[in-house]
From Swiss-Prot:
Reported cofactor(s): Zn(2+)
Name of the molecule in the record: Ribonuclease Z
Co-factor binding details: Binds 2 Zn(2+) ions.
Assigned protein family: Belongs to the RNase Z family.
Species classification: Bacteria, Pseudomonadati, Chlamydiota, Chlamydiia, Chlamydiales
Length: 304
């Protein structure tokens, strides 16, 4: 089974610190590598994380403020240098097309990789291609900003002892899958009689935003919500004026959405540590973590 997990490559906001790089988040899932908001220095962060950049197959840019996109050009150039054979899909707000182009073509180099652009100009399902579904929602920030939800499909899992008891084997199994019922020895066997549905996992990624309904919609029942929490409550006035959230506000969104786990990120450089973020959020939503550079959050498939 391929690795399934979220690796934090950076978790600072506008300004990196000695201990936190600009944000960048790698989701390895179902054989693909999804890179969210590669800030400045992302290529180097892969080295420290001991992860080959070639795992990246899709890049998501929430918006075109520098701390969320300055690493895009260098990542594309690195993938080009490594001569990856798979296409690189890039998703971003359509209104930022000119900024995407400036980052992509900011230096002289011979591009040989296949870059497939997906400029997003509407909310809803962006792609649905079997391994997972990509959805976007417009967040409440100073510029066009997208939040993302990645959801894998539900799958049917057979119960071996019930399959055996029903006398099912061979080609009739495929007929059962296709039709939902088969006749075996004068008995009708329904798919539900010998199987159960494994609920597909989902993760929501929320970059810069004020609290809004779109966050709740994106994160509804998600296994993980990766959410910006730039400030503590004592600086809530800054959060409001800069269209960001506090740790408490992020926790309130997670609680409303009934997510399983909340990971806070995008911390202001004014804070040296993140313990207080967890404390403030934990009063609202207990299963909360503060993102740490190079920390990975594994999530094996749901058993049911």
């Amino acid at each position: 089974m391929s690795y399934r997990g979220l690796t934090i490559l950076g978790c600072s906001s506008q300004q990196p610190t000695r201990h936190r790089n600009h944000g960048a988040y790698l989701l390895r899932w179902n054989g693909e590598g999804l890179l969210f908001d590669p800030g400045e220095g992302t290529q180097r962060q892969f080295i420290y994380a001991n992860i080959a950049p070639t795992v990246v197959s899709r890049i998501f840019i929430s918006h075109f403020h520098g701390d969320h996109c300055l690493g895009l050009g260098s990542m594309l150039m690195r993938l080009n240098l490594d001569r990856v054979s798979h296409p690189i899909h890039c998703y971003y707000p359509a209104s930022g097309k000119k900024y995407f182009d400036r980052l992509r073509y900011s230096t002289i180099y011979h591009e040989t990789i296949k870059v497939i652009e997906h400029p997003i100009d509407r909310e809803g399902i962006v792609e649905d291609f079997g391994n997972f579904r990509i959805e976007s929602r417009q967040l409440d920030h100073l510029v066009d900003t997208l939040g993302w939800r990645i959801t894998e499909p539900d799958t049917t899992k057979f119960i071996p002892e019930k399959i055996k008891a029903a006398g099912l084997k061979g080609p009739i199994m495929q007929e059962l899958i296709n039709k939902g019922r088969v006749k075996v020895n004068d008995t009708i066997v329904h798919l539900d009689d010998v199987s159960y549905t494994r609920k597909g996992d989902s993760i929501a990624v929320v970059a810069d935003s004020l609290p809004c309904q779109a966050i709740v919609d994106l994160a509804r029942n998600a296994r993980i919500l990766l959410c910006e929490s730039t400030y503590l409550e004592e600086h809530s006035h800054l959060a409001k004026s800069h269209y960001h959230m506090t740790a408490k506000q992020a926790a309130e969104q997670a609680k409303r959405a009934e997510v399983q786990q909340l990971i806070l990120t995008h911390f202001s450089a004014r804070y040296n540590t993140t313990e207080e973020f967890v404390q403030e959020a934990g009063e609202i939503f207990p299963n909360v973590f503060a993102a740490e550079e190079f920390c990975s959050y594994e999530f094996p498939k749901n058993p049911s």
